[in-house]
Amino acid sequence: EDPIEMIEPALNQTQVQPQLDFGFAEGLRALMRQDPDIIMVGEIRDLATAEMAIQAALTGHLVFSTLHTNDAVGAVTRLADLGVPSYLIAATVIGVLAQRLARTLCPACKVRDDQVTRETLSEVAKPWRLSGGVRPYKPVGCLECRNTGYRGRAGLYELLLMSDAARATVHPSLDAGALRRQAVKEGMRPLRLAGAMKVAEGLTTLDEVLRNT
């Protein structure tokens, strides 16, 4: 980890120290000698770390890590950009979870939004239809939210599961669009749709969703 932000007694945690030439790749290499069942790499930043994580996965270890990308499909293209061969990506990546945080409306002062927002929301959600009642709200501002109109945050998630059909799109001439289309066909809910559902529930605003996705 870089740095260790929370001590977990049940885990064996190690902090990387680049000044001592002990980075994620070196830490992974040392960790492999301890025969772990599950490995968590704080972040994959370079090819060396990616290669070690891939090798750990190939030898039967369950590996978790993070990447800075725009969405779930972007994690696959990011690994390819780092230099990981497509056949190794297809062989080892099980799934990718993308996350965004959207501010939630203050329950003390939010008010119903107008019909225009309802119609715009339906357009944003296309080709999906929002189930249930659509109840968009807008921020106002009060003492409880310090006149911002927002209190707290809600997670927007996009889960990409690598099925056989999805893996088939991961080849040397990787087409991110083809992978995304296949994932959506198999039920992946894009970040923007996840946000639109939060708007329909009255938890956040369309502007906040569009800003974050």
Residue spans for each PLM region:
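Short, flexible helix-loop junctions that flank or precede catalytic/ligand sites
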Residues: 1-213
